Amino acid sequence: MWKGKTRGGVSGYLFFIYLIRYCGVKAAYGFLSLIVLYFIPFAPKATKSIWQYARRILKRNRIQSVGLLLNNYYRLGQILIDKVAIGNGMIDKYHFKFNHYQEFLNVLDGDQGVIMIGAHVGSWEIGTPFFNDYSKKMNVVMYDAEHQKIKEILKKNGQQQPYKIIPVNEDNLAHIFKITEALDHKEYVCFQGDRYLNADKLLTCKFMGHEAHFPIGPFLLASRMKVPVVFYFAMREAKQTYHFHFILAEQVSGSKEKRAEQLLLEQYVNALEKIIGQYPEPVSYTHLRAHETLANL
């Protein structure tokens, strides 16, 4: 189970920030290609899970699985580099495509707060420049350990966060009140719907043919608050292109057979499966969620 921390030290992130700023994006890609082998032995759990995914789910042979492993780490590194580059004003070096963008903006312009639920595929932060003034009303819910690391990186790099953070700490429920307050003020609250800290507060749903666990929080809040819900994915394509997918969730009403939060989760999983079908690589945490037991076989 994920512990709310993102791989990579602050010094490593800062190195890439300076490399991109003074040598350019292509230089960062080049350096990444030299160090991608590092991740295979030094990220053993991820390596084993990706290998099992390639062999047992995608049915790749050994040579193809090695290629997928190397390509996977390289492409994940590219996404991190892109995130830093765009955050440092290099947006003109990238191309962007959108699905249902105007419908999404219409929801944001409505008379209610909005809940946005993403996943750990692609890179949701890439979309920040397109939100413009909407960013002032965005509240990103993230675990406190990750929040502290991002704060340190931004402070050392002299940058400001374009959106607000609601840190989640297992020891108290302060984040619940902040989320409710943000929605009451017609602001937007952004979650990742595929990771959890508390194994006691989960929903179960069939995902890619396997039973998988998801955090109950985003789906319970969305169903209780009766606000619009948008599923949001920003996916990397060829030639430094990012494709934004906005899926407006249908309103749900629970019953004795199935609660409202479960119905909303099923909509989310359906959207997520379609995205993964379109973008089978790089293999992310989300791809492995339904197959997490494979690493223990």
Labelled PLM ranges:
Residues 1-118, 151-155:
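Membrane-anchoring hydrophobic helices of lipid-metabolizing enzymes
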Residues 110-170, 185, 196-201:
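Catalytic core of membrane glycerolipid acyltransferases/transacylases, capturing the structured
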Residues 146-155, 195, 199-263, 267:
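A cross-family acyltransferase "interaction/gating" segment
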Residues 174-179:
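Short acidic active-site motifs
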Residues 191:
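Conserved binding/catalytic microenvironments
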Residues 286-295:
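Conserved small/polar residues in nucleotide/adenosyl-binding loops
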